[in-house]
From Swiss-Prot:
InterPro entries: eFR1_2_sf, eRF1_1_Pelota, eRF1_1_sf, eRF1_2, eRF1_3, Peptide_chain-rel_aRF1, Peptide_chain-rel_eRF1/aRF1, Ribosomal_eL30-like_sf. Directs the termination of nascent peptide synthesis (translation) in response to the termination codons UAA, UAG and UGA. This is Peptide chain release factor subunit 1. One of its GO terms (cellular component) is translation release factor complex. Pfam families: eRF1_1, eRF1_2, eRF1_3. The gene is prf1. It comes from Pyrobaculum aerophilum (strain ATCC 51768 / DSM 7523 / JCM 9630 / CIP 104966 / NBRC 100827 / IM2). Heterodimer of two subunits, one of which binds GTP. Its main location: cytoplasm. GO terms for molecular function: sequence-specific mRNA binding; translation release factor activity, codon specific. Keywords: Cytoplasm, Protein biosynthesis. It is found in: Cytoplasm. Belongs to the eukaryotic release factor 1 family. HAMAP family: Rel_fact_arch_1 (MF_00424).
Length: 388
């Protein structure tokens, strides 16, 4: 089967969204018998050692009885060796090589060679010959992305949420009766105050227990945001008994209106600086920039597929912004063309509010330009005139 794909080459993948699109592409390729080679090289593995191993595999492949399989495997190994020769070591995050002859149909083959530099380190060395490429180690990076914990707490109510990739969700709500302040005087007031403090402390311990249970099970937990109105959040940290390992991960204590979904959104907004590695916050920052250009620098912005890709083709785009919702083919098309021109791409993940804005207001494509839009308009007019 034949399909559109990026040209063979080296691809530096910067985000989980781009990685997801590339993984889905790699899964489409099929080899004749076990002729597709997957090679994962961690940064610590010397490339000369890898080349020696591949030469040994080339010699072993000479014993394969089927001529097509033997030819494809040896040819693929030879090409990988030639590309790796002269290199001393892999990049800091390692590299994944996917190479071989994709079977379009019986007797009709297409050479495929991709080197993927992933956003997170490859920690092992693997060499695999199979009928398909093995993407498991790359997929592990998708599942093991950075996770942030969020606790929003007010008097008698709390929510615990997780922020992962481009999405967040409330995973636990806690409610407990804690009376309001009592204004009467005397002994009864003092007794009431002590009872209220006791109930508040019991509530904080309940919330801490739930937070400990949830957060300690997440090995990729990057940090925790604690939020809420007034001093309740500080009282919770002081009296609740949050596990010391989690206390060490607290990135920020920020104000938030209330212990519900609106409070979670406000907590994320108020802790943007601490959450800057999150896809959710990155998407918001990208779309904030797009909206700034749309309002203040509209002469340096174009949108829609045709105009954005034309700006990319002409090399006058500083940044291309595309919605993941458009599909992997569209995303890979932009990544491929931008790689050739050295232009930065920002992929807004599906599921975030900013993706809806990008799709509905801009058709899923935006180009932020290095030159005024009239330069692009002039080129489009010339192209239209030439077609008449």
């Amino acid at each position: 089967m034949s399909f559109n794909r990026p040209p063979n080459g080296v691809y530096y993948i910067r985000s989980a969204v781009e990685l997801r699109a590339f993984v889905n592409l790699l899964k489409k390729f099929k080899g004749y018998a076990t002729t597709l080679i997957t090679l994962y090289i961690n940064a610590e593995r010397p490339i000369p050692d890898v080349v020696n191993l591949l030469r040994s595999e080339w010699s072993t492949a000479a014993n394969i009885k089927d001529k097509t399989t033997r030819t494809h495997v040896q040819d693929t190994l030879e090409r990988i060796i030639n590309n790796l020769k002269g290199e001393a070591k892999a990049p800091e995050n390692g590299m994944a090589v996917f190479a071989g002859f994709h079977m379009i149909n019986q007797g009709n083959y297409e050479w495929v060679y991709y080197v993927v530099i992933p956003p997170q380190p490859i920690n092992t060395f693997k060499y695999i010959c199979d009928t398909a490429f093995h993407t498991e180690l790359l997929e592990d990076q998708l599942h093991a992305g950075v996770v942030y914990g969020i606790v929003v707490i007010e008097r008698g109510e709390a929510v615990i949420a997780l922020l992962k990739g481009g999405q967040w969700e409330v995973v636990k709500s806690v409610e407990f009766f804690v009376p309001g302040k009592h204004h009467a005087g005397g002994q009864s007031a003092n007794r009431f105050k002590r009872q209220t403090e006791h109930l508040a402390e019991a509530f904080y311990k309940m919330v801490a227990e739930e937070a400990n249970k949830i957060f300690l099970q997440i090995p990729t937990l990057k940090g925790i945001i604690v939020a809420g109105p007034g001093p309740t959040k500080e009282d919770f940290l002081e009296e609740g008994g949050l596990d010391y390992r989690l206390k060490d991960k607290i990135l920020a204590i920020v104000p938030a209106c209330c212990a519900n979904e609106y409070g979670v959104m406000e907590a994320i907004r108020n802790a943007q600086e601490q959450l800057k590695e999150s896809e959710y916050v990155k998407a918001k920052e990208v779309m904030d920039k797009v909206m700034y250009y749309a309002v203040k620098k509209s002469e340096y912005l174009v949108y829609g597929r045709e105009r954005a890709l034309k700006a990319l083709e002409m090399g006058i785009a500083d940044i291309i912004v595309i919605a993941e919702e458009l599909g992997e083919d569209a995303v890979l098309e932009v990544i491929m063309k931008a790689e050739e021109k050295g232009i930065k791409v920002e992929v807004v993940p599906r599921g975030v509010e900013e993706s809806k804005t990008l799709m509905q207001a801009f058709g899923g494509y935006v180009a932020l330009l290095s030159t005024p839009v009239w330069v692009l308009e002039q080129q489009l007019s010339i192209a239209e005139a030439a077609q008449r």
